[in-house]
A protein has these predicted regions:
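N-terminal glycine-rich phosphate-binding loop for ADP-containing cofactors
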Residues: 1-140
Length: 140
């Protein structure tokens, strides 16, 4: 029998498996990772920033030809809120400089996971909205 995140003692409902909790604490200790609480709002912000950063790379690689294509997929395929207009429209509302600033701060703690998209750098430098970005404009 394998070990999972939870145990179901006596078939009564799940409880956190203390062995897994101990394993997590031990691995964090050896990796010198300080465990911290992260709010739901912070998790949501990090996920959106990661999605925006990756979507910008998708534009830069020519996989998508426009921010509108990404908006369409984000709303119809991923369930992104329609009233936000799609992921890239929402990113334009947040503002590219704001997004670049937030990702740059996160990159200070993990530069591999938070490598800033060249498209975002370009848009910030030129004052271009993501919705106005075209692949042949990049000059980084």
């Amino acid at each position: 029998m394998g070990v999972g995140w939870y145990r179901y003692p006596g078939g009564k409902g799940r409880v956190d498996d203390p062995l897994i909790e101990d394993l997590i604490r031990e691995e964090a200790y050896f990796a010198k990772v300080t465990r911290t609480e992260i709010s739901e709002a912070e998790i949501q912000e990090h996920l959106l920033l990661a999605m925006i950063n990756e979507a910008a790379d998708i534009l830069g690689e020519g996989i998508a030809h426009s921010a509108a294509e990404i908006d369409l997929v984000s709303v119809l395929g991923y369930g992104f809120p329609r009233w936000r207009g799609g992921l890239m429209h929402y990113a334009d509302e947040l503002g590219v400089p704001n997004i670049v600033n937030q990702i740059s701060k996160l990159a200070e703690t993990d530069p591999v996971a938070w490598k800033l998209s060249d498209v975002l750098k370009h848009c910030e430098r030129t004052g271009t909205k993501l919705s106005e970005y075209h692949l042949n404009r990049i000059d980084s």
